[in-house]
Amino acid sequence: MKLKATLTLAAATLVLAACDQSSSANKSTAQTEAKSSSNNTFVYCTAKAPLGFSPALIIEGTSYNASSQQVYNRLVEFKKGSTDIEPALAESWEISDDGLSYTFHLRKGVKFHTTKEFTPTRDFNADDVVFSFQRQLDPNHPYHNVSKGTYPYFKAMKFPELLKSVEKVDDNTIRITLNKTDATFLASLGMDFISIYSAEYADSMLKAGKPETLDSRPVGTGPFVFVDYKTDQAIQYVAHENYWKGRTPLDRLVISIVPDATTRYAKLQAGTCDLILFPNVADLAKMKTDPKVQLLEQKGLNVAYIAFNTEKAPFDNVKVRQALNYAVDKKAIIEAVYQGAGTSAKNPLPPTIWSYNDEIQDYPYDPEKAKQLLAEAGYPNGFETDFWIQPVIRASNPNPKRMAELIMADWAKIGVKTNPVTYEWADYRKRAKEGELTAGIFGWSGDNGDPDNFLSPLLGSSNIGNSNMARFNNSEFDALLNEAIGLTNKEERAKLYKQAQVIVHNQAPWIPVAHSVGFAPLSPRVKGYVQSPFGYDAFYGVSVDGK
């Protein structure tokens, strides 16, 4: 999740560390793009810089695209274009009859990357798995506080409470024991936050007195080797020659940071970008008939929403929250912001996920009803509040600024005056998590195909101070989630999640606004690229004709 949310401000300095250690031998972004049409280099043009390169420390899609999706592997991974898992660093596994013990048999002969910082002396083994879990789990682990890590997704998925032990049985076997059964556990192991690091690399950097290098100069087992990051310009990778699945067809991968959507499109047409992220929705119709563009699309596993801080007046009053739901014209937002690339939302879950409750009736656009509820709540003349505007484009929201303009105008019609507020992305999320938020725009993309991956991180009370931006605290809702996650019967789980969605609808800690359609504009020469339902981009197996 994807929130895919964010890194702390302190951890964001790791990006600068990566830049400081850049090799002077690397080419500039412009030189790299110019070479795109003549060598075996794939150029991926994204909208913003990553917040880091260490998947344990982050919870944000752009950063996962730059780290875990290219550099790392996990015990299990999701099949291309699917929410189904398949073996990865674990070749096979057994689950005990009580559902509490998982024994993983690790793949042999897997090679870590060789970089200028590190030359591995052994293959991947159980020590690397233990390190990757224990760093996040054990407060006394020597790496737990390195890079000021807070492990937001590890906590959002309740792994500190879930995991009883992670034990090395032998070099090629790991046993993970849970404190309680969890129907989502195996799928969760395919998520980016639990990517597998090199324990040997970590140890060597610790002994050298620079442990933060583990996080700023990533070393994994994945298909691409990290080479260099030029801040706010480009990230460069080369193919991992000894990748366990077989070498990728590409020699080099470049993630080029191009903030302007129009410029990204122009570069795609010119052949200096092979795939662009976050196209301008106004350009989609043209792209569909452009011979220089191959446009893929997929319904998104995401939601864009307005979160109310339910601990702060007036948003601690359910009638106020319901009133603001009635006051928003979602149809106008879909037309103006998504322009055919999205559908209106009524639940925190997207309709593409099982257990979606389609029987719930959305709050219709009804300003008069909104005024009535405000009067009943003690605000007959409305009120004044700050409104936070998400500062970046995300998979769930192509234009947060325009969305905010429409919502603020709608609220003004019922007497609610809004003062627009925004911050840099890392600061925006940090302040919201700390409880400064009044009301504001957020988004989330699913990471494992399970409804719990939306409901628990975003609305579970245990995630207040982390990914529950609304600070929603409802014991009945929590009880339903806790019961559902302990069941293995999918139909029984679905019934509970549908009940949970009713509670969210009635209590209105959010305005669920929209679910986007994911578009991938790429060069017609690109082969082997498959859209992920989670909104991530991985380039193993991708090739470009003529390169």
UniProtKB/Swiss-Prot annotation:
It is found in: Cell inner membrane. Its main location: membrane. Residues 1-18 form the signal peptide. A lipid is attached at residue 19 (S-diacylglycerol cysteine). GO terms for biological process: dipeptide transport. Keywords: Cell inner membrane, Cell membrane, Lipoprotein, Membrane, Palmitate, Signal. GO terms for molecular function: peptide transmembrane transporter activity. It is a lipid-anchor. A lipid is attached at residue 19 (N-palmitoyl cysteine). Important role in heme acquisition or metabolism. PANTHER family: D,D-DIPEPTIDE-BINDING PERIPLASMIC PROTEIN DDPA-RELATED, PERIPLASMIC BINDING COMPONENT OF ABC TRANSPORTER. This is Heme-binding protein A.
